[in-house]
Every structure is written in C-alpha cells, then in structure tokens.
C-alpha cells in the first residue's frame, strides 16, 4: 500500500513513533467491534465485486483511531491512500489536483472534513456521486466549464464534529461510522501492545494505571506510555513499574479520572467564576486562554462524558457532580439553592 501524506507533519520523531504503534491491518485494530465487523463485510463485498468501496464517514472525538482506520481501509482494499485535511483544501483547484491524480480504487482521506470551505465541499458532490468534476477554462466572457471523468475512488472523511457537515455532503457517504470512547480494559491491552513495539517492559499494574487515566482515548494512552518510558529510561529501569507510572502521571498533573490542568481550569472557571453557568463558549475560551475550537473539540467531549459538563441552548453548565468537586463555596447565592449558607451542597 502506498501512502502519500499531504498534511504538514509534526515532529519527525513523534511521527515515526506513531507509525510504529499504529495497527496496519484490521485484525490488529483494537476496539470499536461493531464498526470494524461491519467494515470487514463492506470491504469483502467490494473486493468480490471488484469495485471501489463506498464512501466512508468516520466521526467521533479526537484520538480514537479514525486516521488509523482510514489507512487500514486502504490496506485491506489493496489500494493507495492520499491523505490531506479540510483546512488545507482552501481552493477547489487543490481538490481537483488530488482527484485527477487518483487511480482506480484509491482512497482519498480528508481529516477534519467539516472544516472544508463550502465552495470546495460543493466541488466534491459530483466527484463522489458520478466520478466527474467540472473545470473552468479561461476567464471572463470566454470562460467555459469542461467536464472531466475521474477514476472510481473511495473518499474517507474524518470529523470530530459531524453536526457541522452539511446535509448534502453527509448524504453522499454510503457508510457512516461513529467511534465511541474505549473501556479501561481495552486501553490496557493497547498500552501492553505498544510497550512491546517500543521495546520497553511494563507491569500490568502500571499499564492499568495509565489506561485508567487516558480519557478513554488510545492516542492519550500511547502518549502517556511514551512519557512513562522517558521516566523509566532516565531512572535506568528496564520496566515501567506502577511507581514510575504514578510518578509520570503526577508530574503531568493528570488525576485519577484523566483530567489534566486545562480540564480543571475549565471546570473551575465555569463553577466559581461563572457561578456554575450557563456561560458561552467564547467567553469561556477567553477566560481560560484557550482556542474556542480546542475547547469544543478536545476538552468538552470528555468533560461531558465524565458527567461534569452540560451543553444547553444558553451555554455551558456545570453539573451537580462538578459543583461537588470543583466549588470553592463562593457560588452559593447564584446556584438556585444548591448550596447552603456554609457553601456546602444542600
């Protein structure tokens, strides 16, 4: 399988490590059982018919394996994959260049597909449905559209915010799969597998501790494992023990529920500065010094999953569970009787 990356790479060493850890085939992919079982059927049927796989939309919080699965789909189809992202496709001409370069059965992977400009998105419609695109020749009064046929291909789109996709685009995906957070047991297995690939031993208790604080997210579990490996190597330890894992998590300020410094800052701000809410996400972003998109795509999904935050039409609201944990007692007069005169939840 040929892979061509069109996105700007992160640190080269980190990219190489990610590629080492990333499963290459469907049988190596952990979790999302119903999703992968269905994909196996769809891929097998497409190969039997010698057709391109139908277009696939992968949605869900970041770090759950959408990019990995896109590469696996290409591998299972025996196809090449070209990868880019929505923000990079700022002009229809950029997309046209990609589409005309595809061979029969190739996979085009667009990460953050919800961030494509509307004009570029509309350009995809005929490509997805009829495998053709219209190219404008010349300009002004002599401008004319020329129709070009392109090879049948599979578009795999990944999004953390499927609600931002337009209905016409969403309707053109024949396969729509949503990722769920992973259980601690599955994450423990992922950590154990990754430690073997990274050539570092790890105790099961240490793997369990890392898995339990990984927010249900394999990417975070693998990142925490790499940082624990750093601590182990500095201590000249051949195995990551539970003590080393705990030291790593403490130094990174990650608590028992996987909340980090920014999670706590967000909740502390909502509970104590905005009296439990509601507060608009724009105001919240300014208050904590973080980008609005980052709050919505990275932090909020897990805080909602963990039961600390609710989204309402009026803004973000802290739950009773959040008030119990994060209140400093200063919001008693603002929270509708949830607190007594001593600042305790009534």
From Swiss-Prot:
Residues 1-182 are annotated as: Large ATPase domain (RuvB-L). One of its GO terms (cellular component) is Holliday junction resolvase complex. Residues 183-253 are annotated as: Small ATPAse domain (RuvB-S). It comes from the Bacteria. GO terms for molecular function: ATP binding; ATP hydrolysis activity; four-way junction DNA binding; four-way junction helicase activity. It catalyses: ATP + H2O = ADP + phosphate + H(+). DNA binds at residues 311, 316. Its EC number is 3.6.4.-. Keywords: ATP-binding, Cytoplasm, DNA damage, DNA recombination, DNA repair, DNA-binding, Hydrolase, Nucleotide-binding. ATP binds at residues 21-22, 63, 66-68, 129-131, 172, 182, 219. Mg(2+) binds at residue 67. Residues 256-346 are annotated as: Head domain (RuvB-H). It is found in: Cytoplasm. One of its GO terms (biological process) is DNA recombination. Belongs to the RuvB family. Has 3 domains, the large (RuvB-L) and small ATPase (RuvB-S) domains and the C-terminal head (RuvB-H) domain. The head domain binds DNA, while the ATPase domains jointly bind ATP, ADP or are empty depending on the state of the subunit in the translocation cycle. During a single DNA translocation step the structure of each domain remains the same, but their relative positions change. NCBIfam families: PRK00080.1 (NF000868), ruvB (TIGR00635). The RuvA-RuvB-RuvC complex processes Holliday junction (HJ) DNA during genetic recombination and DNA repair, while the RuvA-RuvB complex plays an important role in the rescue of blocked DNA replication forks via replication fork reversal (RFR). RuvA specifically binds to HJ cruciform DNA, conferring on it an open structure. The RuvB hexamer acts as an ATP-dependent pump, pulling dsDNA into and through the RuvAB complex. RuvB forms 2 homohexamers on either side of HJ DNA bound by 1 or 2 RuvA tetramers; 4 subunits per hexamer contact DNA at a time. This is Holliday junction branch migration complex subunit RuvB. It comes from Chlorobium phaeovibrioides (strain DSM 265 / 1930) (Prosthecochloris vibrioformis (strain DSM 265)). The gene is ruvB.
